[in-house]
Amino acid sequence: ATLAGAKRLAPEKSRNVSVGLVAAPAPRLHLSLDAYQIEIRHRIIGSGTLSGAGADAAIVAHGSVLDPSITDATVSYLTNGVDTRTRGLDASGDYATDFGDAGKVKWTAGWNVNKNRITNVTLAGGLNPASASPIIDATPKNKLILNARYLNGAWNGNLRATRYGVTELTVADGDTGGAPYHTNHIDPTVIVDLESGYDVTAHLTLSAGAKNLLNRHPDKAISQGYSHAYVYPSFSPFGINGAYYYVKGSYTF
């Protein structure tokens, strides 16, 4: 990898700053707000795909034999390529309600908004779009969680709705390993999870539920590659498999 331009890795260094507020403005109501900033120096990233004489020399030095029919060999390696900064806000709240014989419900909400930025690039040749995108785009710009936890005697239930904001990832072309680059885009999506359980004894609980109850999938990948084996983008924050239903039992000692 040194022949292709790689250098010995240095440790990443980070500096975190946060400030928070906590309040209980009413009985059974709790609120919190946190602001944070995370700076990472010498962040380790992938170099992206490199080609040319340096790439060919690196492959040969590794002990591999290049097929003479191959005209465009590529290599990639890990490197301390960038400095980054993440700024965000976390807000949360919970409220408890008592409906008497009808049971109790604890309502909770959580919200996050964040922005990632590359503040310095030390990678020789700079960053291509496919190397920069995982750092600044591949996590949701915001996320909202609403949850209701129900308790009534031996019965319990939980309903959760999670809204993921826009998520994107720019990838290299599946045929060239570089340009033209393609940006896979996942629109804001709400995922609903539901579970109901019953305490058979003081130790045994039986439950049934669903993850991703509404069977939501991310937008299909633009560049699917490998004979369209990758239909959905793997960076989806809520997975690619759709709904999952289950029955389970748990025993505590």
Feature roles, as predicted:
Residues A1-E12, V17, P27-A35, E39:
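Solvent-exposed loop/turn elements at secondary-structure boundaries
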Residues L3, K13-V17, R85-L89, P140-L144, ...:
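Residues that define the transmembrane beta-barrel architecture of outer-membrane proteins
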Residues A4-K7, V75-N80, P129-I135, G177-N184, ...:
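Extracellular loop and loop/strand-boundary signature of outer-membrane beta-barrel proteins
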Residues K13, A23-P27, E39, R85, ...:
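Outer-membrane beta-barrel strand-turn architecture
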Residues V19-A23, A91-Y95, A109, L146-Y150, ...:
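Residues on the lipid-exposed face of transmembrane beta-strands in outer-membrane beta-barrel proteins
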Residues L29-H30, A35-D173:
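Gram-negative outer-membrane beta-barrel transporters
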Residues K115, A161-D173, Y198-F253:
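C-terminal beta-signal and adjacent terminal beta-strands/loops
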Residues N158-R163, T170-I191, E195:
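Generic long, charged, amphipathic alpha-helical segments
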